Amino acid sequence: PVAASNAAPIAPAPGPLANNPMAKKTKRVVIRKINNAIDAAVPGSDIYIASWNMRNTGAVKALLRAQKRGVRVLLLMAKENSSTGRQKGKRTTNKYCTTLSRGLAKGNRFVAPERRSGTKLCAHSCRGTTGIAHTKFYLFSQAGTATNVVMYGSSNLTDLAATNQWNDIFTVVGNAEMYAFMVDAFNQMWADVPQPAPYMSGTFANMQ
């Protein structure tokens, strides 16, 4: 069953945005914009997230709420960040990713296979045999009244990205060609299979 939508009917604003970790009012503007877009995702839409790391309680809760509304949520993270190190000789896990993964799996019980949500860890650059998956982007098929939303920038989905780092994000809305290109990139990363070319590039018209 799909819960009634409580998504905010506000479209993510296009354009650049940067945080200042030294300023109380602006240090969380990037993370807040991402989480607000998650909350604005409409039932039946898709969210694709590629983040080198994910450690933000607000994001976990927002993504689980989105799934309950009938949104398909897919989150890809670098394999090396599934662990937070070792304590007293024991490996400690990334509790944020674990909570999200388990929550999404539970929410999939009554969902058709093609609409199931999930998380995945990829090795190296996801598309290659070396490097790390350091790209960060957030895709929404529809958030509020905005369709084909692409958010790309330097910010991981972590508290540290807001409180200890300067980060930026650029949002493009309504560009179906760019959105499809980024979904294709995400799908290649999700497959975690080395690709012939080390990177992807594209040219897009009508950017907003």
Task: Label each residue range with its predicted role.
Residues 1-43, 53-208:
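HKD-type phospholipase D/PLD-like phosphodiesterase module
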